[in-house]
Amino acid sequence: MSGTILENLSGRKLSILVASLLLCQVLCFLLGGLYAPLPAGHVTVLGSLCREDHGRQNDTGFLLYSRGAGACIPVTREEVEQDSTKMANELVHVFQMPLPRDLRDLDYSRWQQNLIGVLQVEFGYDSSSELREPPRELQLTIDMRLAYRNKGDPDNGWKLYAHGVEHRYLDCVTSHVGPTETLYSCDMIPLFELGALHHSFYLLNLRFPLDTPSQMNLQFGHMHDLTLTAIHQNGGFTQIWLLLKTMLFPFVVGIMIWFWRRVHLLQRSPALLEYMLIYLGAALTFLNLPLEYLSLVYEMPYMLLLSDIRQGIFYAMLLTFWLVFAGEHMLIQDAPNKSTIRSRYWKHLSAVVVGCISLFVFDICERGVQLRNPFYSIWTTPLGAKVAMTFIVLAGVSAAIYFLFLCYMIWKVFRNIGDKRTSLPSMSQARRLHYEGLIYRFKFLMLATLVCAALTVAGFVMGQMAEGQWDWNDNVAIQPTSAFLTGVYGMWNIYIFALLILYAPSHKQWPTMHHSDETTQSNENIVASAASEEIEFNHLPSDSNPSEISSLTSFTRKVAFD
């Protein structure tokens, strides 16, 4: 067997390759750090109060807006306080997005991809009321109507996007105690999530119906300020992200074709590690495919779910590959048969499969339902919030356990390699130099794998926490920087690109020599290599199994000769 390119590539060429890949890695970090804005931005909108006619309350096509021709006449807080019924069942809280700036109307761009809304509620009781601390988990019923219009539409050309009557549960604390009323401020609650930001303007109407027979919203005194936080992906970050995907996609496809072609030129079936590399490259190619360009033309509310599925497939394949990659370099073959996933790694991978399926089910339960009802959220009920939080915590703990187990496997690889180095002094000088060079290369590659795994786990945990921070606590501020995101994404591509090159079969043909001539020829190679500026780690003739991908994995079966 000719071995892999990692074994046969000269020191100078390998150094040039590694330096080039490290330079690309630095450029990926700089691309996000210098040119991309923060991944997400948000705007805070204070609700406007409008009063509607009783006859239009059940008309879902009737929408009130606060800016433009035909806007509603705003109701002041003083007018509400002076009304004997506090305008019950007549008030509509209006939120029009985005807000104008410098007397100029702004609009959303399709580059911003998605929109998430969370609401902070403030309500009050008369100070004469005996209630001083509201009970926890107050159930609030909200009639929500979300509408949109585009550039060129008239000011009153709002079209209904979604309508629903939803329940939210509030945890509140006392914020102000006055002579006439006591105010309570509540934690943020998830309101809606749009997987596609296809239209220019959005309008949200909120009603809080009161009904005595069904005890609907009677535990609240009267609503005060409502604050909507609208979170969107920054368009500048999306452009940098798609630029990175567009540049990386053809390189990965090209190197996969090159790798698989070299494998099929061999007179053997592909090894397990070669299959795993091509599967990993396919998962990365699916992730790199810049499908987001389609959302600039078509409305694709399922893009968030599709992105989660693509990233989940890549994570599953990457985690699987690392376990197999470390296992194949253990240098311990329990059986002479060819390694398969089912025979050697099913115990290791069962946890990965269960974890990925659990996260997929969790994602489908939320974002799958949101395709039909953007107001749905698993965080809206106390039980759902606990289940969601449990999933996130378990995902983080599982990621940490996986990383520790991978560290243990790589440590075993290092220990096994160290144990086998004790046989090097009994070998000929040529073979000893050959294997010492291979050992250094494989150790460096294993350390690079460990760094890649650590950054991947850190990025996964930060992503889960950043996604849920608006749902569990408004005081948490976790947002991965653009440099970190583009750097980690580039690292995945560079790492897999390097593996496909280094583990491709080498087609160098070395002349066959008799055993009696090998020592003389090896010594001549050593002298020539020492005098050369470029040292070649030549593959020495051996009786290695042709099904093995690397000569290092057959190290234990090599017989030293002089």
Curated annotation (Swiss-Prot):
GO cellular component terms listed in the entry, alphabetical order: cell projection; endoplasmic reticulum membrane; endosome membrane; Golgi membrane; neuromuscular junction; plasma membrane; postsynaptic membrane; presynaptic membrane
Which UniProt keywords are given for this protein, alphabetically ordered?
Cell membrane, Cell projection, Developmental protein, Endoplasmic reticulum, Endosome, Glycoprotein, Golgi apparatus, Membrane, Postsynaptic cell membrane, Segmentation polarity protein, Synapse, Transmembrane, Transmembrane helix, Wnt signaling pathway
Q: Report the glycosylation sites.
A: N58
Any GO MF annotation of the entry: Wnt-protein binding
A Gene Ontology biological process term: imaginal disc-derived wing margin morphogenesis
User: Its principal location?
Assistant: membrane
Topological domain ranges for the Lumenal compartment: 35-239, 292-311, 366-390, 463-482
Enumerate the subcellular locations listed in this protein's record, separating them with semicolons.
Answer: Presynaptic cell membrane; Postsynaptic cell membrane; Cell membrane; Endoplasmic reticulum membrane
Q: How does it assemble?
A: Interacts with wg; in the Golgi. Interacts with Vps35, a component of the retromer complex; wls stability is regulated by Vps35.
Q: PANTHER family in the record, alphabetically?
A: INTEGRAL MEMBRANE PROTEIN GPR177 (PTHR13449), PROTEIN WNTLESS HOMOLOG (PTHR13449:SF2)
Name used for this protein in its record: Protein wntless
Give the organism, scientific name. Answer: Drosophila yakuba
